[in-house]
Each structure stands twice: as structure tokens, then as C-alpha cells.
Amino acid sequence: MPGRDQLTGQKALSGNKRSHALNTTKRTFDLNLQKVTVLQENGTKKTLRVTAKNARTLKKLGLVA
């Protein structure tokens, strides 16, 4: 599920896939994006696509609806 984190702007990384013979081919490390409903300051709800790490942080801060 490629894309960007709507909270921090984090995006996928690129790197190399290494075979047993140490041949290299380009690959991407995609983000683990999850849909999270967040309570805004004015009391409304908004759905964001954030990484699993940021979803845990939002839940810890009590901002998840």
C-alpha cells in the first residue's frame, strides 16, 4: 500500500534486494499505512492514513476516536 503518511509526510524508502549470490535489484520498502479516525480540537472526526507506529502514538495520546 504505497503512499505517504498524512500526519508526518513520511514516504517509502528505496534500497536493494539481495539474493543468495549477493546480486542486487532495486526495491521499495513500503509503509504500513492504516486508516485511523482522529478527534480534532473542534470536536469533529477526521480519517487519516498514518503508519502503524504513528497510529500507536495517537492511541497513546488519546486522540483516536
From Swiss-Prot:
Key words of the record: Ribonucleoprotein, Ribosomal protein
Protein name (database record): Large ribosomal subunit protein bL28
One of the record's GO molecular function terms: structural constituent of ribosome
Cited NCBIfam families: L28 (TIGR00009)
Domain of life: Bacteria
Keyword Ribonucleoprotein in record: yes
GO CC entries: ribonucleoprotein complex; ribosome
A Pfam short name: Ribosomal_L28
Sequence segments annotated as region (Disordered): 1-21
Family from the record: Belongs to the bacterial ribosomal protein bL28 family.
Any GO BP: translation
PANTHER family: 50S RIBOSOMAL PROTEIN L28 (PTHR39080), LARGE RIBOSOMAL SUBUNIT PROTEIN BL28A (PTHR39080:SF1)
The keyword Aminoacyl-tRNA synthetase appears for this protein: no
